[in-house]
């Protein structure tokens, strides 16, 4: 069974769709042009009210759902920004996609999405 590709709709109004994979090639497609590295980043800070709840949850154990949601939203925003840059360069796919995180300050984290913008046929 063939692996399904990740396809993102950039905007319903624009009607733009782009392929995103974490491999060097897009299965079933040929890379005809490499447009270079593209990236998207966001820096998010924790919410004080959520920190209090997380403190108590941390004592008892379990998932910190508020932080899971925050990281998920941050990841999505970084990916969206990366894809917007790729579309701006004329790409219809991004290969070798990676996502990295780093602590900027004790209360804030950076999420970086990056990959190589390409044209595939």
How should each PLM-predicted stretch be described?
Residues 1-50, 88, 111-121:
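N-terminal presequence-like segments and the immediate start of the first folded domain
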Residues 23-26, 99-104:
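Short, solvent-exposed loop/turn elements at beta->coil junctions and helix N-caps
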Residues 38, 43-44, 50-98:
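Short, well-ordered alpha-helical segments
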Residues 93, 107-109:
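Positively charged, aromatic-enriched nucleic acid-contacting surfaces
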Residues 104-105, 115:
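C-terminal structural segments of small proteins and small subunits
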């Amino acid at each position: 069974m063939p692996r399904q590709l990740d396809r993102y709709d950039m905007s319903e109004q624009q009607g733009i769709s782009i392929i995103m994979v974490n491999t060097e090639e897009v299965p079933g497609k040929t890379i005809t042009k490499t447009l270079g590295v593209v990236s998207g980043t966001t820096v998010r800070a924790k919410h004080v009210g959520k920190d209090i709840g997380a403190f108590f949850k941390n004592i008892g154990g379990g998932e910190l759902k508020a932080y899971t949601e925050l990281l998920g939203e941050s990841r999505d925003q970084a990916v969206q920004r990366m894809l917007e840059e790729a579309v701006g360069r004329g790409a219809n796919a991004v290969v070798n996609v990676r996502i990295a995180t780093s602590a900027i300050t004790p209360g804030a984290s950076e999420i970086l999405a990056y990959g190589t913008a390409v044209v595939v046929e």
